[in-house]
Amino acid sequence: MVLDCVSTGKAGHAARNEGINAITLAMKDIEWFNTYQFPEKSDFLGPVKMSVTIIHAGTQHNVVPDRCEFTVDIRTNEFYPNEKLFELIKSQVGCEIKARSFRLNSTRTDLQHPFVRRAVMMGKEPFGSPTLSDQALMHFPSVKIGPGNSARSHAADEYIGLMEIRAAID
């Protein structure tokens, strides 16, 4: 889930210590996003992860900003559907928040599903992926498989090694 957040202050001249600094207001909420830990942790996905990824504020060096916009990327687990998580967050922060969408929740396939059990019999180990995929739109049991290391996703030098491809084929 992605949240667009806005902290609103009051513009003023920096030299006269006027106004209410929207950046200072946003910092309190950003600190909450950086430190809060939801109590329910998934065996496969771990805790809910919240990362502030974009911040925009201010227009001039001598003006106290009246608006600070920031974006939060949230990776949920099966204990917190997006709408429930949104309401919990809304009750904790002072900024205005809007979710871009509620439809892409985390997913999990039962470990007792025949496909998962067969994969385990073949020596594969079930795991959780914190990344988002089309799997979130599938309303039937599914698994996410393929070569490579998810930790290299979205990096400047993203790649899959030839040996990883060969191992996946075998």
Labelled PLM ranges:
Residues 2-170:
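Metal-dependent amide/peptide-bond hydrolase catalytic core
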